[in-house]
UniProtKB/Swiss-Prot annotation:
Protein name listed in UniProt: U3 small nucleolar RNA-associated protein 10
One annotated Gene Ontology cellular component of this protein: membrane
Primary gene name: utp10
Repeat region (HEAT), residues: 581-619, 1038-1076, 1110-1148, 1244-1282, 1288-1327, 1756-1794
Compartments where located: Nucleus, Nucleolus; Membrane
Species annotation: Emericella nidulans (strain FGSC A4 / ATCC 38163 / CBS 112.46 / NRRL 194 / M139)
Length: 1801
């Protein structure tokens, strides 16, 4: 044993209390997010839950997803959940719920409800300790806010490694800075990983929010960039390895992020990371492709713009501009990808992406099924998004693709590619780049030209080389392009019978043109082609087949090379001699079309052909027109020109312009326009008017009769430049074409597009352009094409017609606009469902309608309503019916619907036509408003939309008029009553607001017309508009108040009316609306109203009306306080004086202004007394909570001019309040409220002024007033005591007044109030002058106070004395004798049977608590004895007494009173404590325990004798109670008391050393075993108590006191031989013995029980208790108590010999006694030692199992001895025994690792 038992005991004590460290628990409980540590520490979980649950409920209203947590972490059950008591699985489940909630609440942490809800997680579940990482990450996006600083303050010191960066900021109590977080992310990859995992988890839960994702995106982007920068190295392989590590860390995050497409901010953040990776790391091409595919696969409409930037940056890093197929297809699917790329190209490089798109567009040209790719390609070059170098690369891609296609592409694809290549050479910006590409590349242009059947213009080419190359190409292509077979097939065709221009679909033409395209590049092939019989070349001069074929080719949608070849063929034909007598004017329209072709090569061919025709014409004299009757078919009649006219046209209008046309495709249009308009009269070259007319009609007739649309489109393009010529117009001449086009069906139009490849929309626009705005009936003509409507009309044509009308509308004179508008309106109001209605309406909305049109429309509304008026019910029925619409038939309803639609459309047109520009509409808008009101009453409909439109138009006109010096319209037409009706009768907020704004505007322009009907407006505002919280409604209210109220007040003043009563309805409207006005707008709104009305005149009225209507509603009181806070002191006091006048007026028999403002005396008014009480309570609140006190003090200190007025107003208010109080003494509510006002009024005074005032009031005879005044003083002292010297001195002087009241007043309540004031003064100022308070204490302790019969004054006096003791300390000693005697007498009185006074009882114990703390030495032994006896009586009382005060007093006694005095008193009164019962005994033992704990060791040693005496008496309690006939303790009480005694004894032992304690222990052993043998029951009781103590003794002090067991071995053996669990008298002792032994064995570290002398004595008696297992019940007891004890003994024995001895005894119980024991052993072991009973054998087997489990192989060393027993037991007759032995065998096999079968056989 150690030399210093005390030191070792102290160490054990320290270790044993760690788990019960109450201080640490209180500290943990005080960790709060929103409360101060001190406040938080005082809160219980019920209080916390109520606060936090309110926040949680608000969250549920914000987001329904929070509701799921109401059943778990916010349930009532959660208040008692302690995670320290949960197992691992339960904690894991709880963590998942907590993290789900934190994730969801993260987005709302700046809202107060969210912080409250999280507070519950912190206080109840301590998430900041158990879920630290997740909690910090939830708050981290708000790292710069105060709430994050609050979190830092409560976090544990040891933060997760990923978040160590926060530790310095936690220590310094400052917010972290962003740069620190970024730097840590760079250097600490754990932070990046942790943050990524958190963000992904939150997003999967769909709890993401902007703050989190914005924070995450910024941190991870900067972090990854910094990581990549910091990993740069001079060694490339090292740097690459580091970069690869970073990429591998980030890619899984990107993969998970891209998968959540709907979380747009997360996806955009991933795009940002991709950009960083692309720019900072050298990514492999496959990685770039993978990232691009991931980006395009993840984008949505919302993220597409950001994704496109990301793809552009990634593509920029690729060495080759080749896009993955998925990326290219995704780009194609985008809406207008080039526009989006153009938008981002200003900030990001897009060249590689664009080049990738080019490469994708020209990839696999032969397999492309549509034109989308080539259209995109064409747009790319036109958009010029690439610089010259990149444009050159793009051109190279196209040219390489074009040179590689051969003859495998379709004609359409060939044409589109040819157009693109031609654009390269035609475009002024692209041509230089194209030229450079050709010069620098090895691309064979001839191959491209051949493949595309075009000629690339403006590129100088050596003709000889070109011819040779073309020949070579021809030779090489001969075998592969199919030309020969096609030509051979066509050679078999017979001659075509008519012109190739007669029809769209001619099968043989399609074959011919394909073959001609193949031959166009070879003169030999062309020569062979023209000789085909089907072309009838031999009859070309007389029949149209030959030339018509080539005309159709060069005017169709074919490659330029093919067109040029056709023109060349024509040119060569017509220049031959055979054509010298032929008039070929039929070719002129087509040649003009060719001159306008975009291809210079085609234009050149046309120029050459026309030049040849011009040469032929010169030689002609008179000849017939070629193909005159057969060009378009037999039925076509063209007004052909005469040969001379044709010659003039050529010579004057065409041939001179040819060379210009060769270089400029637009020139022919200008030339033709000039020619047809006519030149100067003196010009020899001018074309005369008749010829112009003939030429114009000639061209127009071709445009009309030409069956083909491609050449017709070209001709129209030229003709639409000319409005009129030679007295006719193009509209007139081309009208047949317009009608033809109109009559075509959708299918026919589709065929045109399919066969001729023209744009239908462009052609349709050209056709409709034939109608010019200069045409007189142009709009009527256009309308005639769609009216009457036919279902066969194409919708696109109808839409185009109305678009054309819209285009020419502004160029048409106003009179025609008016006429057209009427027709359009008729169309728009038709009942049919034709598209004409919608198109007409849309047109009317788009065009600018003149004022007369709008006026005409408006005039139709009243007339229409009058017409339909007859549909309504009869007048009588209208007055009585609740639903007038019932009277209408279905037909009537249809008419009504039509009328509503018509009116809506008219008003929409007016509203959309800038009505402010048409003030002439004002009268008819008001007429319309009147008609709508009338109609509304008839059909029982609100018609809000119509009213809104009408009012909106009027408002626009009025607002424009307000800006001018005088109204722009006749104000006599204004109908303010109608506008007010709109305000009152509609439910539409839009209508209400617009009407209010209109009233406000009219009140400026014409106030005399508005103000007489303004009051209903404010009534309406109160019930409707004031409730709104949108910015528009706020603006409406502001304008209404600003503009209407001043005008109203001015009007009342002019009429010499009282302005307050005159505006009562207005005030009532606003006050009635208070509860509906959004809270944050109330103060601003009422402040604006009062300011406009006049604060001094109206503030009191508004306050009174609010108080009358809402009484003490907190929100109203706050508003009232805010309203008075802006007024100065004089205005505020004046307002209160008027307010009190109004209260007085309300209490008169004949009220005045209060009847108007408050409804006093009216039928529906409230009782005057209730109104007065409410008003006074509100006024009291204002006095207490306004800033009046500060205002008065400031004004009086500075002695301003208002000082005297303030004093006068204050005096007047005081007199008013006192007068109301005196006159209303019989009306308690009003009298009390007046007292509250008085209290509030006094609160505005300084302390000295206040005391002077109440001292004067105390001299009044009215006791009620005096009590009220003292109550005010007590309240003031409690709330805000003054600390200046003068105030303190004046307050102490006032004690004499109060003492005098206590001594002399017969009024108990007044005395009570005086004592309360004495108490408060003592508490606040007593230490300044203790002597003055001492005299007061003596009075309070005298018969005048606590000596009275009234319990109220007694209780208050005793509590006052307690306060005096705390404040005065020793100065209280003179009063103590009387205080002690009277207080103990009162305590005894409070405990009288059937007269228990709990409050008095508590007050006395409170007094003694103060005495024990401050004057413990002044409480004598006799007083202490008396107090203890009374406290025992209190504890034993059955009455409902509060134990807390009594127990607190006893605790203070134990801690503060001298230990000797206290213990002596307890020892003297121990018997009374026991007699009083368990509660008293418990409390006195608590006192002893606290005394030992709080006093030093020396005090314990000094009082050891008396302490031991008390403990021995306490230990003997069980014996006394068991032998007593009237026991007050039941078994549970005894066990609880003994547990407490054991705890006290252990605490005493901690204060002793071995020398002091060992004698006490020996004495205790003697005491326990020293009773005479005949006192069996007493001996059993003492041993039970003693062994229960020893169990705690060995369990607490452990190995230090194991040696003390030597004193008890003999006693224990004796008990083991006699005690039995089946004997009720010894069962308790048996249980105590087993548990004590187990505790002693368990903590043996000094080999005490290994000693044979010790173990031999105890082992056999202990093991023999297995014999008591004879039934299921006793077997269970033995299993839970005896077997563990035997096991612990075996563990402590720890030697083979000892184990063998134990096993020998144990195995006897595995067999029946006859089989297991010899006669000698049986004799030695005693009777019944064996396993006769199966339950005994089972118990022995369970013991073996326990020993095997705890000792393992050490125990199984005895297996050879056990095997015979095991074999026998496996064949035991009892199934239970057999089952247990098999379990043991399995256990043995598990330990040994081998089976026992061989050993058992």
């Amino acid at each position: 044993m150690a030399s210093s038992l005390a030191a070792q005991l102290s160490q054990i004590a320290a270790n044993s209390t760690n788990q019960l460290n109450l201080k640490a628990q209180r500290l943990a409980h005080s960790k709060s997010l929103i409360f101060d540590k001190r406040v938080a520490g005082s809160q219980d979980f019920d209080t916390i839950y109520d606060i936090c649950y309110d926040g949680f409920r608000e969250l549920c209203q914000l987001d329904f997803r929070f509701a799921q947590f109401e059943r778990s972490i916010f349930s009532e059950q959660s208040k008692v959940q302690d995670r320290t008591e949960m197992n691992v699985e339960q904690n894991r489940e709880l963590d998942s719920v907590l993290e789900a909630f934190l994730a969801l609440v993260g987005g709302r942490l700046l809202l107060s409800p969210a912080v409250k809800a999280v507070e519950w997680l912190i206080r109840r579940f301590r998430v900041h300790e158990y879920n630290t990482r997740f909690t910090i990450l939830t708050f981290l996006p708000y790292y710069s806010t105060p709430v994050f600083l609050n979190l830092l303050a409560i976090l544990p010191d040891d933060l997760p490694s990923a978040l160590k960066v926060l530790i310095p900021y936690k220590r310094s109590a400052i917010n972290p800075v962003r740069q620190a977080l970024v730097q840590n992310a760079i250097s600490n990859r754990d932070l990046i990983t942790t943050l990524n995992n958190y963000v992904l988890q939150v997003c999967r839960q769909r709890a993401h929010h902007h703050a989190l994702l914005a924070f995450w995106a910024g941190i991870i982007t900067e972090g990854v960039a910094g990581m990549l920068d910091s990993s740069r190295s001079g060694r490339r392989n090292v740097e690459k390895q580091k970069h690869d590590d970073i990429i591998l860390q980030i890619l899984p995050v990107l993969n998970d992020g891209f998968a959540m497409k709907d979380v747009s901010e997360l996806v955009i953040g991933c795009y940002m990371v991709c950009v960083v990776l692309a720019q900072k790391a050298e990514l492999q091409d496959r990685v770039l492709d993978g990232l691009m595919e991931a980006v395009t696969g993840s984008w949505t409409e919302e993220t597409m713009s950001s994704g496109l930037i990301c793809v552009a940056v990634l593509a920029q890093q690729k060495p080759d501009p080749i896009l993955p197929k998925r990326v290219f297809k995704a780009m194609l699917r985008m809406k207008d990808p080039l526009k989006q790329l153009a938008d981002i190209s200003t900030e990001y490089k897009t060249s590689q992406l664009l080049l990738g798109l080019v490469a994708g567009c020209v990839d696999s040209l032969s397999t492309q099924k549509d034109s989308a790719r080539l259209e995109l390609l064409s747009s790319m070059f036109k958009s010029q998004l690439l610089n010259d170098a990149d444009t050159a690369k793009a051109m190279t891609f196209v040219l390489q693709a074009a040179s590689a296609v051969g003859g495998t592409i379709s004609l359409d694809t060939q044409t589109q590619i040819a157009e693109i290549v031609q654009h390269f050479s035609r475009s002024s910006s692209l041509q230089p780049v194209f030229q450079k590409v050709i010069d620098e590349s090895s691309i064979d242009l001839s191959v491209i030209e051949y493949n595309l059947q075009t000629v690339i213009e403006s590129v100088p080419v050596n003709k000889a080389i070109e011819d040779v190359e073309m020949e070579d190409a021809d030779k090489t292509e001969t075998a592969t392009d199919g030309y020969d077979s096609a030509l051979e097939s066509l050679a078999k065709e017979s001659s075509f019978s008519t012109s190739f221009l007669t029809a769209q679909s001619i099968p043989v033409f399609d074959k011919l043109v394909q073959t001609f395209a193949l031959s166009a590049g070879s003169p030999e092939r062309v020569s062979a082609f023209v000789e085909l019989p089907v072309l009838c070349k031999a009859n070309a001069t007389t029949s149209p087949q030959f030339l018509s074929f080539f005309v159709r080719v060069f005017t169709g949608m074919y490659p330029a090379g093919v067109k040029a070849a056709a023109l060349k063929t024509i040119s060569s034909i017509v220049s031959s001699a055979a054509w010298s007598d032929v008039d070929v004017q039929a070719l002129l329209p087509f040649m003009l079309i060719a001159l306008a072709d975009p291809s210079e090569r085609v234009r050149s061919g046309a120029v050459d052909a026309l030049a040849n025709i011009g040469k032929v014409v010169d030689k002609k004299k008179k000849s017939g027109v070629w193909a005159r009757d057969s060009l378009y078919g037999k039925s076509m009649h063209i007004p052909w020109l005469s040969s001379s006219d044709f010659q003039k046209i050529l010579e004057r209008a065409v041939l001179p312009e040819l060379e210009e046309c060769r270089s400029d495709g637009e020139h022919i249009g200008r030339a033709l326009e000039n020619a047809l308009r006519g030149a100067a009269s003196d010009s020899a070259s001018a074309i005369k008017k008749p010829l112009r007319l003939a030429f114009f009609t000639y061209l127009c007739s071709h445009a009309v009769h030409l069956p083909l649309f491609a050449p017709r489109a070209g001709l129209l393009n030229l003709l639409n430049r000319v409005d009129k010529a030679g007295g006719t117009t193009r509209t007139k001449e081309l009208e047949p074409l317009l009608k033809k086009w109109r009559d075509m069906s959708e299918q026919e139009v589709a065929e045109v597009h399919e066969k001729e490849q023209i744009s239908v929309s462009d052609f349709e626009a050209q056709v409709l352009k034939t109608v010019t705005p200069k045409e007189k009936d142009s709009i009527n003509l256009l309308l005639s094409t769609v009216t009457p409507y036919s279902p066969s009309l194409r919708a696109s044509f109808v839409s185009s017609v109305f678009n054309r009308i819209s285009e020419i509308w502004g160029k048409v004179p106003e009179d025609r606009q008016i006429t057209a508008a009427e027709k359009l309106f008729e169309l728009s109001t038709q009942a049919s469902e034709s598209p004409l209605v919608d198109n007409a309406r849309d047109l009317l909305r788009r065009v600018e309608l003149p004022g007369p049109v709008l006026l005409n429309y408006l005039q139709q509304i009243p007339a229409s309503i009058t017409d339909i008026d007859s549909l309504g019910p009869a007048p009588k029925r209208r007055r009585t019916s609740q639903n007038n619409m019932v009277a209408m038939t279905t037909k009537d309803e249809a008419k009504l619907s039509k009328l509503m639609d018509k009116m809506t459309f008219i008003l929409e047109l007016v509203d959309g036509s800038s009505p402010e520009a048409h003030p002439e509409l004002t009268e008819w808008l008001f007429q319309t408003l009147a008609a709508l009101h009338h109609f509304k009453s008839q059909i029982q409909s609100g018609m809000s939309y119509l009213l809104s439109l009408t009012l909106g138009s009027l408002l626009a006109i009025v607002n424009r008029s307000r800006a001018s010096s005088k109204p722009q319209f006749d104000t006599s037409v204004v109908r303010a009553d109608l506008v007010v009706d709109c305000v009152r009768t509609t439910e539409s907020p839009q209508v209400q607001n617009t009407a209010l704004l209109l009233v406000a505007g009219l009140s400026v322009i014409a106030p005399e017309l508005v103000l007489h009907s303004v009051m209903p407006i404010f009534t309406f505002m109160g019930s409707s508009v004031l409730r709104k919280d949108d910015d528009y409604s706020v603006s409406v209210i502001d304008q209404t108040i600003d503009q209407v109220v001043p005008a109203l007040i001015q009007s009342l003043r002019h009429q010499k009316r009282d302005v307050v009563s005159g505006t009562s309805e207005l005030l009532l409207s606003f006050t009635a609306a208070f509860e509906h006005i959004p809270s944050h707008r109330r103060l601003r709104l009422f402040h604006a109203l009062i300011t406009k009305l006049g604060t001094e005149e109206f503030l009191f009225a508004v306050l009174a009306m609010l108080a009358n209507r809402y009484s003490m509603d907190k929100a109203v009181l706050v508003l009232m306080t805010g309203l008075v806070s802006d007024a100065d002191a004089t205005v505020e006091l004046s307002t209160y004086s008027k307010f009190l006048n109004l209260v007085g007026d309300s209490l008169k028999s004949k009220p005045g202004i209060s009847q108007v403002l408050l409804g006093i005396g009216s039928d529906d008014g409230r009782e005057p007394h209730k109104v007065a009480a409410d008003l006074l309570r509100a006024l009291a609140y204002l006095f207490k909570h306004s800033s009046l006190k500060v205002k008065i003090a400031r004004a009086l200190t500075t002695e301003t001019d208002d000082s005297e007025r303030i004093r006068a107003l204050f005096s007047n208010i005081l007199e008013q309040v006192l007068a109301i109080g005196e006159s209303m003494q019989s009306v308690k509510p009003v009298h009390q409220a007046a007292g509250d006002v008085l209290s509030g009024l006094f609160s505005t005074l300084t302390t000295i002024d206040f005391l002077d005032t109440i001292e004067a009031l105390l001299k009044r005879p009215d006791d009620a007033l005096r009590r009220k005044v003292l109550s005010l003083l007590a309240t003031r002292l409690q709330q805000s005591p003054e600390r200046d010297g003068a105030s303190q001195t004046r307050m102490l002087d006032f004690l004499t007044v109060l003492v005098d009241i206590v001594q002399s007043s017969p009024d108990i309540l007044l005395k009570h109030a005086a004592v309360t004031c004495i108490d408060r003064i003592t508490e606040k100022y007593g230490k300044k002058e203790p002597s003055m308070v001492t005299s007061a204490a003596q009075v309070v302790a005298s018969a005048s106070c606590i000596g009275q019969e009234d319990d109220r004054i007694r209780i208050n006096g005793v509590l006052c004395l307690a306060s005096m003791v705390e404040v005065l300390g020793q100065a209280m000693i003179p009063a103590l004798p009387e205080v002690l005697n009277r207080s103990l007498a009162l305590l005894e009185l409070s405990l009288e049977t059937n007269k228990v006074n709990a409050r008095l009882h508590d007050a006395v114990f409170t007094l003694f608590s103060a005495l024990f703390v401050h004057l413990p030495y002044m409480v004598s032994a006799s007083h202490l004895d008396r107090l203890l006896v009374l406290s025992f009586k209190s504890a034993a009382s059955d009455e409902d007494l509060d134990n807390e005060n009594r127990q607190e007093a006893l605790h203070f006694m134990a801690r503060k009173v001298d230990m000797a005095v206290a213990l002596a008193s307890i020892e003297r009164n121990w018997t009374q404590a026991v007699s009083a019962g368990p509660s008293a005994t418990h409390e006195v033992l608590d006192a002893i325990s606290l005394s030992i704990e709080k006093h030093p060791k020396s005090a314990t040693m000094k009082n050891l004798s008396v302490l031991t005496t008390i403990l021995f008496r306490a230990f003997d309690l069980r014996r006394e109670q068991t032998q007593s006939s009237e026991s007050a303790f039941d078994a549970s009480d005894l066990e609880e008391i003994e547990d407490l005694i054991n705890d006290v004894t252990i605490k005493m032992i901690y204060k002793l050393n071995d020398t002091a304690f060992r004698p006490i222990f020996i004495k205790l052993v003697e005491w326990a075993t020293g009773l005479p043998e005949k006192n069996t029951q007493g001996g059993l009781a003492r041993l039970t108590t003693f062994y229960r103590f020893l169990q705690v003794f060995f369990g607490t002090l452990q190995s230090i006191v194991t040696g003390y067991a030597s004193y008890i071995i003999e006693s224990v053996v004796s008990v083991l031989e006699t005690a039995s669990p089946s004997n009720p008298n010894t069962k308790s002792l048996w249980l105590a013995t087993m548990r004590m032994l187990r505790s002693a064995f368990e903590h043996d570290q000094d080999e005490f029980w290994q000693s044979p002398s010790h173990i031999t004595k105890i082992s056999t008696p202990l093991i023999s208790h297995l014999r008591h297992a004879t039934s299921t019940t006793t077997g269970a007891l033995v299993a839970t108590e005896t077997i563990p004890t035997i096991t612990e003994l075996a563990v402590a024995a720890d030697s083979t010999d000892n184990h063998k001895e134990l096993n020998t005894v144990l195995m006897r119980f595995l067999r029946p006694s006859s089989a297991s024991l010899s006669s000698s052993s049986t004799k030695r072991a005693g009777p019944g030692l064996g396993g006769d009973n199966p339950q005994t054998r089972i118990a022995a087997l369970k013991t073996e199992q326990a020993l095997t489990e705890h000792l393992g192989e050490d125990w199984l060393a005895l297996l050879p001895e056990m095997l015979p027993y095991i074999s026998e037991l496996m064949e035991d007759e009892d199934e239970g025994v057999e089952r247990e032995v098999r379990k043991w065998v399995k256990q043995i096999e598990g330990v040994l690792g081998e089976r026992l079968d061989d050993m058992l056989t």
